Amino acid sequence: MASQNSDINQLDDRVTLGITLMLGFCAVAPLLDVAAKLASPTIPVSQITTARFLLQGVIMLPICLWMRHPITIARPLLGLLALRGFFLILATYCFVAAIAVMPIADALAIVFVEPFILLVMGKWLFNEQVGRRRISASVIGFSGVLLVIQPSFSVFGLVALFPLGTALAFAFYMLVTRRLSRQMEPVPMQLHTATLATAMCLPVLLWGHLSDHPTLSPLLAPVMPQGIAWLWLLGVGIFASLSHMLITCALRFAPSATLAPMHYLEMVSAVGFGYLVFGDLPNLLTLTGVVIVVGSGLYIFHRERLTEVAQASGK
């Protein structure tokens, strides 16, 4: 009996540690967005995106070596890793382009449509069982996103749709990550994704530098950061690496079903940092949309949890 109680206490301690790390992620992740937004007035979005992956690779390499993970890429996994990097580039570029002109919390609220997209993609692409309740929750959640987009679209134009691009790209990124997570450790996966993403971004920057295209060259050509802009770029890389490490470690100690609903706490941090740094506060319509999105997302996680329990008890 004493041994059983000890095992239960150890399990509780691991879950508590996982929850603590997830709370750390929710606090740190918006700092990446803050650093990117601060850099965006003087640094092109493409350069901020590249800096994120370049610095993340530089930071993750010694961590990977210290943890004694292999740093070579297995050939069969190269294609999936490159695809993962590609979707993360798209997600990052769209989001940085959006928050360059939009409040961070507004953009993040739109991105939170991603679980609904992932749910629909799972049903259509992999024939996963998705009940009417979760489909209905997805539709309601998307209506909440429209409440956020509507005032943003009237103020910022087509840029307000960029977070939807982030959500779609991130949904594909998650599908690829699911496949890869069965075949490799998360820390080397982050290192290799950052390395391959950097390798894809650098030629684009070089083309922007050499090109004289009247529209694309100003968007893609790198510039020499001046003064404090160096600090913002460094912050992008540091906070990207730290947030990924926190969520990776959190998933090692606590089940994803426990941690997933907590992801919405990132919205609280985003609103707080957005107000403290930029003086941005969501209006009533945006807040209503956020509540609908978060509520629908939490309901979907609840239904998925019930489905998992039912499947486990039926075995």
List the predicted regions and their residue ranges.
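Transmembrane alpha-helices of multi-pass small-molecule transport proteins
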Residues: 2, 17-20, 43-90, 169-176, ...
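Membrane-interface helix-cap regions at the ends of transmembrane helices
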Residues: 7-9, 57-76, 145-155, 198-228
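Loop-to-transmembrane-helix transition segments
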Residues: 16-24, 64, 70-96, 158-164, ...
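Hydrophobic/small/kink-forming positions within alpha-helical transmembrane segments
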Residues: 26-31, 61, 85-93, 115-120, ...
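Transmembrane alpha-helical segments that form core, pore/gating elements
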Residues: 37, 45, 155-214, 218-224, ...
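Helix-helix packing/entry segments at the starts of transmembrane helices
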Residues: 51, 108-113, 180-196, 241-275
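C-terminal transmembrane-helix exit sites in multi-pass transporters
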Residues: 115-136, 268-287
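Hydrophobic transmembrane alpha-helices of multi-pass small-molecule transport proteins
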Residues: 133-150, 285-304
